[in-house]
A protein has these predicted regions:
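Membrane helical hairpin/interfacial module
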Residues: 23-28, 32-117
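Selective recognition of specific alpha-helical transmembrane segments in multi-pass small-molecule
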Residues: 44-55, 89-99, 127-128, 148-162, ...
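Extracellular loop-to-transmembrane helix junctions
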Residues: 29-57, 335-351, 361, 365-371
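Hydrophobic alpha-helical segments and their helix-loop junctions in multi-pass secondary transporters
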Residues: 93-96, 100, 132, 149-174, ...
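Hydrophobic, membrane-embedded alpha-helices of multi-pass small-molecule transporters
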Residues: 5-26, 41, 45, 49, ...
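Membrane-water interface regions at transmembrane-helix termini and the short interhelical loops
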Residues: 32, 108, 125-146, 204-208, ...
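Membrane-interface "cap" regions at the ends of multi-pass membrane proteins
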Residues: 1-28, 34-36, 204-208, 359-377
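Membrane-interface interhelical connector segments
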Residues: 240-270
């Protein structure tokens, strides 16, 4: 595999695809409580995010230039690795179909309410197919190119909203139990779990020789920026429209920004948010389409994948229509099934893998010690 991706591009991609969930799904899910409970949930999410970051560092250092499938082969052998990859492939199909729906609903609920979902599906698939023909390197470079402008615009939105903040909306004591707070933290953890997916591209990273300090630095900065942006967006959203209203809106931050002006000069510029969410959705769909194709490649031992692009696009089109029919179906699928499934695929299985990794190291070191003892005898 050609080394075409840098660590910076990997982490930029994670932040870019996280923007839409930060603006839509997570504030709506955290709105069950209030700003105080949301802050506590963010802190609780670190209990999972910090170990996940350490896990990524361990795997990157222990298996340099290995992708996720090759790591599984090293730990379990080829047969078990193919079964696990098939499981990851099914999961990525469902996530991809859900992301296509979420992108569609974001546009329908904001500026194109009378447009049929099939139009959005086909439009996105054409764009993704074009991106795939340009190559995965181009997709990651595009994420690197658009992330900084997206973040600058979001911070301008947040600063512009400060004069309109209602403190009585956010100065509320937490009323949720610890188990409910953990449930809210689960939504944050499920979105942040995309960090684990960088292991999928371990064989494509250019600068693996610098992995130790470089990965740690990028991980700390990425997680910190993710959480800071999440806190700011959630607090601003709750302080403008209230947590009760946020819970009932699919795009709460977009609604909160309506009527906000910059220096009393620029007004009604919330439409730029639609472009930002579209770019984030586009990159997220590209990423999960790439992961799905890689899982097919590894599970079926296929070398060339271009002939599968159009059949796979048609498959995802119909899978999305079969899985969901309405916004209620999408929300039910995500909140009831997909969040828990994400936690299993991005946390439970990886942490099980790290246990197997260290147990194999322990067995190997024990055998080496026995060999040394016998040789001395």
């Amino acid at each position: 595999m050609k080394k075409v991706i840098t660590f910076r591009q990997l982490f930029y991609m994670f932040l870019a695809i996280s923007i839409t969930p930060i603006l839509t799904l997570i504030p709506a899910d955290l709105a069950v409580g209030n700003s105080s409970s949301a802050g506590i949930s963010v802190i609780l999410s670190l209990v999972a995010l910090i170990p996940l970051a350490l896990l990524i560092v361990v795997f990157m250092k222990a298996y340099p230039h290995y992708n996720f499938y090759e790591i599984l082969v090293e730990l379990f052998g080829r047969a078990v690795a193919k079964v696990l990859i098939a499981f990851y492939g099914i999961w990525s199909f469902v996530v991809l179909s859900t992301k296509v729906w979420q992108y569609t609903l974001n546009l329908q609920s904001s500026i194109m309410s009378n447009t049929r979902e099939q139009v959005f599906f086909v439009t996105m698939m054409i764009l993704v197919l074009y991106a795939f023909l340009r190559g995965i390197k181009t997709i990651f470079r595009f994420a690197e190119f658009v992330l900084v402008p997206m973040l600058i615009i979001l911070f301008i939105y947040i600063l512009s909203a400060i004069p309109n903040i209602r403190l009585d909306y956010i100065k509320v004591a937490n009323t949720l139990t610890f188990s409910e707070l953990c449930g809210q933290a689960g939504y944050i953890i499920a979105a942040a779990g995309n960090l684990f997916l960088i292991l999928i591209y371990g064989d494509s990273v250019k600068d693996h020789s610098k992995s130790g300090k470089l990965i740690a630095r990028f991980l700390i900065a990425t997680i910190a920026l993710f959480l800071v942006l999440l806190i700011l967006v959630t607090v601003v959203t709750f302080s403008l429209v209230g947590n009760n209203a946020s819970a009932m809106i699919s795009t709460p931050f977009y609604v909160a920004m309506k009527g906000i002006s910059v220096l009393n000069i620029l007004e009604h510029f919330e439409a730029i948010l639609i472009i930002i969410m579209f770019l984030s959705d586009f990159l997220g769909i590209c990423l999960y389409a790439s992961i799905s194709m890689r899982c097919i490649k590894w599970a079926c031992s296929v070398r060339k994948m271009k002939f599968l692009y159009i059949p796979f696009a048609v498959f995802i089109y119909y899978l999305a229509l079969v899985l969901c029919r309405t916004q209620f179906d999408v929300e039910y699928l995500y909140n009831t099934i997909l969040v828990k499934w994400n936690l299993i695929m991005q946390y439970v299985i990886p942490f099980a893998l790290i246990i197997v990794h260290y147990s194999k190291i322990g067995v190997t070191s024990t055998r080496m010690q026995r060999v040394e003892v016998k040789s001395k005898q």
